[in-house]
UniProtKB/Swiss-Prot annotation:
Residues that, per the record, bind Mg(2+) 2: E298, N300
Every ATP-grasp domain range: 133-327, 671-861
Catalytic activity from the UniProt record: hydrogencarbonate + L-glutamine + 2 ATP + H2O = carbamoyl phosphate + L-glutamate + 2 ADP + phosphate + 2 H(+)
Official protein name in the record: Carbamoyl phosphate synthase large chain
Record-listed ATP 2 binding positions: R707, R746, E752, G777, V778, H779, S780, Q820, E832
Organism taxonomic ancestry: Bacteria, Bacillati, Bacillota, Bacilli, Bacillales
Binding site for Mn(2+) 4: E832, N834
Region (Oligomerization domain): 402-546
Organism encoding this protein: Bacillus cereus (strain G9842)
Cofactor binding note of this UniProt entry: Binds 4 Mg(2+) or Mn(2+) ions per subunit.
Length: 1072
């Protein structure tokens, strides 16, 4: 059936900010879909709130709206643009929920808009647990015995009937939000209460736990002619019970017999047909390892995290084809873009093994509960490809960016058998490493299988790796053993340690003995047809399929998995850099390992290598390609950290030299440079011992800011107010020694300013200056940023511009630089300089229209700023106000403190833009998920040091009609200022207390600042967590609170009696 001609304009709904459960995979799928629809001649309008993505570039769609994804704003866009149809299935759960909300509000009917891809009835049948259960029963498809509940009482009734354990799955949520496995009444009460709150329809499915079954996923496609295919099937190494986003996954499935494979394939196709989905769909199934009994777990009637993985694993571009199917094209009409010969109705075939390992944020959140269950906790993932499972797994392990090069962790060697058993049964982020350790210590595969029901096939593969370790250790210098180890995926780093040599020595030994990898192509058809895609993975074998061309080439290093501190912003910069390299006439080669991102779409670069970002893996590519050089500026800290080792190997680092990178990162060299340039900075020194640290802090004076050198995302940074806190930090947060010094700075309570600039060594161009709402001390990634600055005097702005130009030239920067300043007592100080792309590059590029990564790349390749039409100086400011607001995933991470500080905690960001600061803030806050009601109650419990400041805030809340609630201490201070307040009991009170108010939804805001000391700190933590669990906005910075007040005040009409007005006027006369 040819494409539809009765529709012209299509509104695509994006997925909004990156949160746990919904990450960069939707930037990839959304970008693909918009391009795919435009190829077919449709006018595409995009709405998304996330400025950090390629998807929200103006070139992606005919019109791009960066606006909150709420009913209010999307309805406005529909009324203004009058699209013929909307496509919500590429915007993740956000897109689906938005479609349902729009349909129910009546706007779609009012404006004559139809839903493409997945019909509303199919969305509801798949997402509403009750309707889905009914459909499965009609199809005679087995599902675990279950019930739908809307109250806690109903949950208790069901458990009486079938007993524990039970799984709770809230309706219309993603990433398992609010769900979990309950083994007793206490867990049931906690998880069901939370699940009902998180479900927008207050509905949960309670089902008998089938934990321990194999978890299998099928990624299926169907068109309007009822052609349906399986694109890829995947198997979770972790059995049912761990969310698939937190599971280690392999593709294709490894342990299914043909009968099992066909049985589950038929079920998946039967389900997509019954739902009538036109496009992509993900079916999750559980299979009893001891029989042919299977269960349908759930269906995602949309493009998902798994479809991004399936696309990259097979090369089959699911989102691109799903968009074409949505407008009426059929699988037998669409050419497969990979082979450019076969049609899209051919099911992909794989002649390799793909492994995906999640990347968790536990290195950031030491206190988080690491146990894995049905609620997702990973922020991102890595993927690797190999010719055997061992090779594929070990390549994935070293892609994780945890400084780990093998399936072993030093700290696990101390574990006794009982501890290992507990952790393997319970499942946490280190389970696979613990399984390997258990096998090293002689625990049998049978015992491990009994503990966690992991399939013997996977346990055998881990045992093969452990046996190979023994071979390597027993045969030092044996090249045959080395060849076998490399075929199994062992790294030079591991072999070097086992043979007591350096990594470089092993590398040289291999080259001499000709033990080097070859590169194979990902072609969707197991080499049955000739393929046109330059998409490669390394393995050890005979024939190399990646042929070097005669063109000059440049290698760009990507940023690896999405994690806190290094998000999709760096992928954005990487993609723009690749485009600029191509425009400049070079061959662009990209190395990256993140299956979710646009940069690993094979159509972006001239060559894509899906490989770990380690020195060994990158050097193999450089040895083959012999590029002009490597660009490390756009891959975040991942790429910067490889610069020195690459240079040791004789590789040319393009852009800012290694020496100058080091001058910006090394504390003493940086201080010397600033002194030479005459630029002030907060007093600070470097400590290499605990005693030194104590002496420096005494000399500078508390409070001080302490942090390790060379970090991204403020890892292990803290503001310390007295010596006990400093000693606690030195003992727990860092291992200080000569090679890893700790930086100690005077902490200045001032306004923080952030600047991004581009330098060619001679000229320095500044696209934008941003002002942070939160004062210095809150990480820049967690602050609300405002452009253009709203409260900077011209004099201060000039100082900032002068310092930026001096730093760009003085540090010999070639490419991008990001500078953070603090304004303290009308003086500008430099806090830090990052000689690389920062997380604000996409935001400022979109606002100013200066394609920063593109311009910087051309500078790096030798085209100076003047040639490109830019010179030295500050880009004219825009008239509108733009706000960048952070988005957090605290609801997914139990026991993480939500207090903001110098350590970054946000996972994503949104943008709000309008004519005034208040309106832009309103949009930014609403887009980030903060509800802003014009009236209600606010709970105020603040630290003593903040009481004075909190008085003015409380007064303003009272002025606009808010009811104030406070515990005794704060209430007394308020009463002394004649501010009406209602006293509430502290949380340790047996009577109705502060936590009860939060749980019952009787407060709209909670203002709580961090109090140091044991009990108050614990109380504050419980108040903050309770707020998150109950969806109440908890404000831990008084600056953020002031910003929200500005918005509330701008929305509220004043209500003063005439007497108050005349008194105010009389008061003014007296003062005059």
């Amino acid at each position: 059936m040819p494409k539809r001609l009765d529709i012209n304009t299509i509104l695509v709904i994006g997925s909004g900010p990156i949160v746990i459960g919904q990450a960069a995979e939707f930037d990839y799928s959304g970008t693909q879909a918009c391009q795919s629809l435009r190829e077919e001649g449709y006018k595409v309008i995009l709405v998304n709130s996330n400025p950090a993505t390629i998807m929200t570039d103006t070139a992606t769609a005919d019109k791009v709206y960066i606006e909150p994804l709420t009913l209010e704003f999307v309805s406005r866009i529909i009324r203004k643009e009058r699209p013929d149809a909307i496509l919500p299935t590429l915007g993740g759960q956000t897109g689906l929920n938005m479609a349902v909300e729009l349909a129910k509000s009546g706007i779609l009917e009012e404006c004559g808009v139809e839903i493409l891809g997945t019909k509303l009835s199919a969305i509801e049948q798949a997402e509403d647990r009750d309707l889905f259960r009914t459909l499965m029963q009609e199809l005679n498809e087995p599902i675990p015995s279950s019930t739908i509940i809307h109250t806690l009482e109903e949950a208790h009734e069901f458990v009486k009937e079938i007993g524990y354990p039970v799984i709770v799955r809230p309706a219309f949520t993603m990433g398992g939000t609010g769900g979990g496995i309950c083994s007793n009444e206490e867990e049931l009460i906690e998880i069901v209460s939370g699940g009902l709150k998180h479900s927008p329809v207050t509905q949960c499915l309670l089902e008998k736990s089938i934990a321990g079954c194999k978890e299998i996923e099928y990624e299926v496609m169907r068109d309007s002619n009822d052609n349906a295919i399986v694109v890829c099937n995947m198997e979770n190494i972790d059995p049912v019970g761990v969310h698939t986003g937190d599971s280690i996954v392999v593709a294709p499935s490894q342990t299914l017999s043909d009968r099992e494979y066909q049985m589950l394939r038929n079920t998946s196709l039967r389900i997509i047909r019954a739902l009538g989905i036109e496009g992509g769909c993900n079916v999750q199934l559980a299979l009893d390892p001891h029989s042919f009994q299977y269960y349908v777990i759930e269906v995602n009637p949309r493009v998902s995290r798994s479809s991004a993985l399936a696309s990259k694993a097979t090369g089959y571009p699911i989102a691109k084809l799903a968009a074409k199917i949505a407008v009426g094209l059929t699988l037998d009409e669409i050419i497969n873009p990979v082979t450019q010969k076969t049609y899209a109705c051919f099911e992909p075939a794989l002649d390799y093994v793909v492994s995906k390992i999640p990347r968790w944020p536990f290195d950031k959140f030491e206190s988080a509960n690491r146990t894995l269950g049905t609620q997702m906790k990973a922020t991102g993932e890595v993927m690797s490809i190999g010719r055997n499972l061992e090779q594929s797994l070990l390549k994935a392990v070293r892609s994780l960016e945890l400084g780990v090069y093998h399936l072993e962790l030093e700290h696990l060697k101390e574990l006794d058998k009982e501890t290992m058993k507990k952790r393997i049964i319970k499942a946490d982020d280190e389970r696979l490493f613990i399984v390997a350790e258990a096998i090293r210590q002689g625990v049998t595969k049978e015992e491990i299988n009994e503990w966690c029901e992991m399939d013997f096939f996977f346990l055998q593969k881990v045992e093969n790796i452990v046996n190979m370790e023994r071979e390597v250790k027993a045969n030092v210098g044996n090249m045959e053993v080395l060849q076998t180890a490399k075929e199994m995926g062992f790294s030079d780093h591991y072999v070097a340690a086992a043979w007591n040599k350096t990594e470089r020595e092993i590398y040289d030994m291999r080259k001499e003995s000709n033990i080097t990898p070859v590169y194979k192509m990902v072609d969707t058809c197991a080499a049955e047809f000739e393929s046109a895609t330059p998409y490669y993975y390394s393995t050890y074998g005979d024939e190399n399929e990646s042929v070097r061309t005669d063109r000059k080439s440049v290698v760009v290093l990507g940023s690896g998995p999405i994690r806190i501190g290094q998000g999709v912003e760096f992928d954005y910069a990487t993609v723009h850099s690749v485009w600029a390299i191509k425009e400049a006439g070079y061959e662009a080669i990209i190395v990256n390992n993140n299956p979710e991102t646009v940069s690993t779409d094979f159509s972006i670069s001239d060559k894509l290598y899906f490989e770990p970002l380690t020195i060994e893996d990158v050097m193999h590519i450089i040895d083959l390609e012999k590029p002009e050089g490597v660009i490390v500026q756009f891959g975040g800290q991942t790429a910067i950290n490889l610069a020195a080792k690459l240079e040791e190997h004789g590789v040319k680092i393009l852009g800012t030299s290694l020496e100058d990178l080091d001058r910006a990162e090394d504390r003493d060299k940086f201080e010397a440079a600033l002194t030479q340039l005459g630029i002030p900075q907060p007093v600070g020194k470097t400590a290499t011992t605990v005693e030194q640290a104590v002496a420096i802090a005494e000399e500078i004076g508390y409070p001080v800011l302490v942090r390790p050198s060379y970090v991204l995302g403020g890892r292990a940074m803290e503001i310390v107010y007295r010596q006990e806190e400093l000693l606690h930090y030195m003992k727990n947060a860092v291992k200080v020694h000569a090679e890893h010094p700790v930086l100690i700075d005077r902490y200045m309570v001032g306004k923080e300013i952030e600047v991004d600039a581009i330098s060619d060594g001679e000229n320095v161009f500044i696209p934008g200056i941003m002002e942070h709402i939160e004062r210095a001390g809150v990480h820049s990634g967690d602050s609300i940023g405002v452009y253009p600055p709203q409260s900077l005097s011209e004099k201060l702005k000039e100082q900032i511009i002068e310092h930026t130009i001096a730093l760009g030239k003085g540090l010999n920067i070639v490419g991008l630089l990001n500078i953070q300043f603090v304004v303290f007592k009308d003086q500008v100080y430099v806090i830090e300089v990052n000689p690389r792309a920062s997380r604000t590059v996409p935001f400022l590029s979109k606002i100013t229209g200066v394609p920063m990564a593109n311009v910087a790349t051309k500078v790096i390749l030798g085209q100076d700023l003047v040639e490109q039409g830019y010179g030295t100086g500050y880009h004219p400011e825009e008239k509108e106000v733009y706000v960048k607001a952070p988005v957090f995933s605290f609801a997914k991470l139990r026991s993480v403190d939500t207090t903001l500080g110098p350590e970054m905690k946000s996972t994503g960001e949104v943008m709000g833009k309008d004519l005034t600061l208040e309106k832009a803030l309103y949009k930014g806050l609403v887009a980030s998920g903060i509800n802003i009601p014009t009236h209600g109650s606010v709970i105020i419990t603040v630290a003593d040091k903040d009481k004075e400041e909190a008085m003015e805030i409380a007064k303003r809340f009272h002025e606009i009609g808010y009811n104030l609630l406070a515990t005794a201490g704060t209430a007394q201070s308020l009463a002394e200022q004649n501010i009406p307040v209602q006293v509430v009991n502290k949380i340790d009170s047996e009577d109705y207390n502060l936590l009860d108010i939060i749980r019952q939804g009787k407060a709209q805001f909670v203002i709580n600042t961090l109090t140091k000391g044991k009990q108050p700190a614990r109380d504050g933590f419980r108040i903050r967590r309770e707020s998150v669990e109950n969806g109440v906005a908890c404000l831990t910075s008084l600056d953020t609170t002031r910003a929200i007040l500005r918005v509330l005040e701008s929305m509220t009409f004043s209500a003063h009696s005439m007497k108050e007005i005349t008194q105010t006027k009389r008061h003014e006369v007296v003062h005059a």
